Amino acid sequence: MTKNKPSTAEKTRLICQNKKAYHDYDILEKFEAGIVLLGTEVKSLREGRANLKDSYARVRKGEVFLQGLHISPYTHASYNNHEPERVRKLLLHAHEIKRLTGKTQERGLALIPLKLYFSKGKVKVELALAQGKKLYDKRESIKRKEENRELDRLRKRRRQE
């Protein structure tokens, strides 16, 4: 008899998110990229010990590298542990890298990681092509969110009456 294989549905598990990126940047486009990791880094990510805050990606010599990603050392490893803040290579298609190179150089856009997650057993990074917000833009978006919350509260009260 053959064993039933697990469904081929996309199995994803979120490791960490960069919520501050949505506040500080206007997200224009999103990409999914693989990431080159060491064994202890993957084990540490399975424990959920990562931080995307203040991380960004750069294109150098036709390759994309992620800087500032903090993956805490694996607790059960001995002397073979990894460096927590090392530069990690991202895996993208060549045509995507060319596109990103052009856009980041021309318009002054930034490559910001939004999420780090497991997809079918592999660690993936959701990268965003983003433009930095000015201070007044941030204030405006906060004001808009507060107004929407107030409207929702009023609607809820009317429904209850």
UniProtKB/Swiss-Prot annotation:
* Residue segments, region Disordered: 139-161
- Please name the InterPro entries in this protein's record: SmpB (IPR023620), SsrA-bd_prot (IPR000037), SsrA-bd_prot_CS (IPR020081)
Coiled-coil parts of chain: none
Concerning PROSITE patterns, the annotation shows: SSRP (PS01317)
Q: Does the keyword RNA-binding apply?
A: yes
Q: Which UniProt keywords apply?
A: Cytoplasm, RNA-binding
Q: Name one GO cellular component term.
A: cytosol
Where located?
Cytoplasm
Example GO molecular function: RNA binding
| Stretches with biased composition (Basic and acidic residues) | 139-153
Q: Does the record bear ATP-binding in its keywords?
A: no
Major location (coarse): cytoplasm
Question: What biological processes does GO assign it?
Answer: trans-translation
> Superkingdom of the source?
Bacteria
Matching entries from HAMAP family are given as: SmpB (MF_00023)
What family is it from? Belongs to the SmpB family.
Q: Which purpose does this protein serve, as stated in its record?
A: Required for rescue of stalled ribosomes mediated by trans-translation. Binds to transfer-messenger RNA (tmRNA), required for stable association of tmRNA with ribosomes. tmRNA and SmpB together mimic tRNA shape, replacing the anticodon stem-loop with SmpB. tmRNA is encoded by the ssrA gene; the 2 termini fold to resemble tRNA(Ala) and it encodes a 'tag peptide', a short internal open reading frame. During trans-translation Ala-aminoacylated tmRNA acts like a tRNA, entering the A-site of stalled ribosomes, displacing the stalled mRNA.
Give the protein name, as stated in the record.
SsrA-binding protein
Traced from the root, the source organism's taxonomic lineage reads:
Bacteria, Pseudomonadati, Thermodesulfobacteriota, Syntrophobacteria, Syntrophobacterales
Protein encoded by which gene: smpB
